[in-house]
Amino acid sequence: MTDEEEAPQDLGERIRRIAATIAGGVDKRLLAGDDSESVLDAAARSFGATMERWGRNPSLRRLLGGVQRDVLTSQGERVELSASLGVSAKLGTTARFYVDDAVAGEAPIDSSGEVRILINAPAPGLYRVGVKVCNDKGKVVSDLIGYRLLQVASGRPVVLVHAALVLPHLSAGRPHPRTSPIEALRALVDEGFELAYFDIHEKNRDASIYEELLRQRLPPAAILVYSAEEEELVSLGVDFVNMFASTAIRRLRAKGVPVTTVLTERDEDSEESRAEQVTVMTPSTVLRRALAGTLGDAAAQAAELLRDKARSSPLDWRLDQTTKSRVVPGNSFAAELDNGKARRRLFAAFDEAAATIHIQFYIVRPSDFTEHLIVKLIQRARAGVTVRFMVDALYSDQDVLGRVNPLILSLKAEDNIEVIAVNPIESRKQVGVSSLKKRDHRKLVIIDGRRAFVNGRNAGDEYFSGFDEVPVHDNTRHERIPWLDAHVEVSGPLVREVQETFMRTWHRQGGAEIPADQDVLPKLEPTGSAAGRLIVHRGLADTNGLAMYESLFDVAEDHVYIVNDFPIVPTLERAIYRLLARDVSVKLLTGSATARRDDGTFFPAPLHRTLFEYMVKGKFEPLLLAGVELYELVTPPSPMIVARGGRIRPYVHAKLVSVDGLVTSIGSANLDATASFWESEANVVVQDAEFARGVEAILQKLIDGSVALDPESQYWKRERAQRAVVSTLWPGTFYS
């Protein structure tokens, strides 16, 4: 390695050596390694710390460039190293990443100024990650400020240290511990723990934390920052700390990092900490337990976690850890993307019901489908079948400030039908961020506790009308045009979990007790050979849907199909970039939020639909430019479609991901921030190759008939200005 290619070092050390050389040996302690600190030592350390802090400041990093974040992982795990190059992007063609003094990899520089590489985590230890910018001849032309830490866990129990302990001025309103954290940290290290720091906040406070760690001479370790700002999540004053904390612990364990303990400003033996099997302690508790000799229990817990990981497949381990779901064998699954067939199958299932029909919808709106649904349910109720019907209060306009949905009123008039509006808003005092954003987005149907439908369809014509069933001419309103949607029908032991999910919500929302003679949880025998799991996300309580999608992306080796038409949350965007970095094919089938004619022009529609279309496509553009194959759905020709071209480009409402012809997810969860954080969702993950291959064959047929979006095409370019303006101005609260 030449001098100009010297690997990134601690800036304080580099400044120290330069200063010593200039001083001509005046202060030999500088290079002799003397522990006493000279004035020059202190100046070099202070200036170096300042430069490192600049490299950790998000705003300065975007301007001047720098490595994005510290990483904590385990040996052999895939690790993404990323950097923003800032103004340095203009100086070269390649970014060269270093891990300590070794070149870890290179990435070409494009117009985004963002670079990333994937490596396999090295042996346990603490490594410095830096980046240099090189020209087309491989010569270094710029050295980015600062470095980040790659911490590879050793297998010892890991304690996450809350930043509030070292940043007392940032923990406003919280009691600060009387015991200095340094004493507790030393005790934990002496007992065999490995340390890492974490912060959960609206803003990215990484630079302040780093500065304080240096000032207090605290042990170096990765600083893990979970900020709403970086997730483009508008929190609207809602406290996300518990949700992000459990997410952080689960994600680290999924990577083989045995987190057993959290060191924070107050003891919290809470339901959440018990559920995550983590011990929460204050510094004083640590010292007390160290004296009592009871800190060593964590080592056995860490060892057991690593043994469990070694016994599991990568997919099962990640889903087990990040979603707290369990795989259930012995099921049969059937997917349906044809709206007309879905309607006929659903009504046939109602006719087959002998004891109970349980239904949950997000939206129930006036439509021909809904009228038929109401009649069918009343018929079955009068035939002796008990019907339990749940709707989201806000989006079905039921029990919100006294409002009543007349469709639901007809159901409530029947003796054998019970109706609940989930999360009603009974007075203006209840109107607030949580009541408006924390909604129940699930769509479930369970027949006799033996058959279930988990899907994305609401009660409306656009969800249950086939593209060949609706007359469409050039001036047909967007609202009349069907959407692409999907459900998965389940029979077998997994149905019990769907039923239990429904019943938990039913009872939590005040539903009537189940009669003793009505067995809503019958014993279920295997009906097939397919394994699957139910992923349930509770809004503001966990991030199970987000974790499900990230886990599926992270285990993919060959290809991924995504069917969705919502802006993708940054966590999943980064996961998609990791897919592309390891040459995994990514096909994204989307639609048009305002339906288009075959030539790409819009059908008549409300303005907000067209603005939403521009915003979503604007959010997809970086993925398209990075290498994602983006397709806009086009329906087959139909005698019922007489609009120009004889075909339409409809909205895509399905929420479907399929990976490697091995595993598929279908349900209610979009890939956006609303589904990831705010609303409650339910998806089924089918871990069966035959099912996945069948679904992917359907998707590929849809893609073959669709329009491949090309950033250089006139179709894409003609709306570029609109996308740019709307993406910039669209209020984040609407899609986060």
List each model region and its residues.
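Non-catalytic pre-domain segments flanking phosphatase-related domains
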Residues: T2-V161
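Alpha-helical substrate-recognition element adjacent to the catalytic core
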Residues: L60-V79, P124-L126, G130-E231
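C-terminal cap/substrate-recognition subdomain and adjoining C-terminal extension
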Residues: G192-E194, R205-Q301
